[in-house]
Amino acid sequence: MFDVITIGTATRDIFLTSPLFKVLRDPAHLKKIGFKTAEAQCFALGGKIEISKPILTTGGGATNAAVTFSRQGFKTAALIKIGEDQAGKDILDELVREKITTLKLQTNNNGTAHSTILLAPSGERTILVYRGASEDLKLKEIPFDKLKAKWLYISPGRISFETVKKVIDYAAGRKIPVAFNPS
């Protein structure tokens, strides 16, 4: 039995920084074209922009939480869906290094989710997201017989409400507490 099983998103994150990423604040014009905050992160269109060394990490609600729990000494598993690709392999390798059991589901239909985080010098960020396999976790794929834990932690991203509800109902029927992070 695990202390905690995390269920939800797993992504390959790429952090990019550059002094050439500029923040533009122009309420008069930006709100008119759909920028609700009246702010935009900008760089020259068509340019070649120098960046600092890219940082590649594992991200996503389920994997980030699993690493946190494992580092605190909890026996942890992560139920995630990834693609059969290098990014998925990298995520699995990191979870092994962090002593996390993976209840992984792999698919050829979608690649592993990716996020590219553009960090401006001021610390503000813009995130480009490909949700990939993470949002495609289906109810019929969940190995309910393996959800043996003292706690479940659910960070679903865009996993369907029906799937999340069934997992919560399953946990409630077995008196397993659930922590829910709607992402």
Positions of the model-derived regions?
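A glycine-rich helix N-cap at a beta->alpha junction
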Residues: 94-111
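Glycine-rich phosphate/adenosyl-contacting loop at the front of the ribokinase-like
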Residues: 1-77
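Conserved beta-alpha-beta core of the PfkB/ribokinase-like small-molecule kinase fold
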Residues: 151-183
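Conserved phosphate-binding/catalytic loop of the ribokinase/pfkB sugar-kinase fold
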Residues: 103-107, 117-161
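Anion (oxyanion) recognition and catalysis
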Residues: 70, 96, 172-173
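Cofactor-binding loop segments of dinucleotide-utilizing enzymes, especially the Rossmann-like FAD-
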Residues: 7-9, 81-84, 107, 119-121, ...
